[in-house]
């Protein structure tokens, strides 16, 4: 069986997020930044949705192995693409999920408006991932200095993301 490791607690986050969304069999769902496609496989198995498992860092050829191993090749379609250059038509998806990936590409002021064009009007966009309890202002606390490297500067607090998304005027948060 192909490896399914990837983002920390991706399946737990997917289960939690999906519980807050109205996913129904046959819906077309974009799983953006799906990593090794474990969240996509889960969504197909649990909800019967069709999933476009889209990731930049893991190849579609690698992900299809896991998808086949899971027996969901009929409803999970691996795509290798950059989140900032998606190959989909406007309003193609019924829903979009981003599990433990949005912070890597979504902090640009214009990104949410770009992403929203791919979901049908009033379609849900669900985002779950790691973050900060509060923003780090000023010097980094001693206990975080070793951990606080460029790799994690993209992490923000829930209140930061709320302000970031609310100002677009296109999402109910």
Question: Predicted regions span which residues?
Answer:
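Class I SAM-dependent methyltransferase Rossmann-like catalytic core
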Residues: 1-8
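Conserved alpha-helix/loop element of class I SAM-dependent methyltransferases that forms part
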Residues: 8-25
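Class I SAM-dependent methyltransferase SAM/SAH-binding core
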Residues: 30-32, 36-85
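A short acidic, Gly/Pro-enriched loop at the edge of an enzyme's catalytic core
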Residues: 84-96
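A short SAM/SAH-binding and catalytic strip from SAM-dependent methyltransferases
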Residues: 95-107
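A short glycine-rich, Lys/Arg-flanked "PGG" loop and its adjoining helix->strand segment in the class I
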Residues: 109-124
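Short, glycine-/aromatic-enriched active-site segment of Class I SAM-dependent methyltransferases
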Residues: 130-152
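Short alpha-helix
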Residues: 153-169
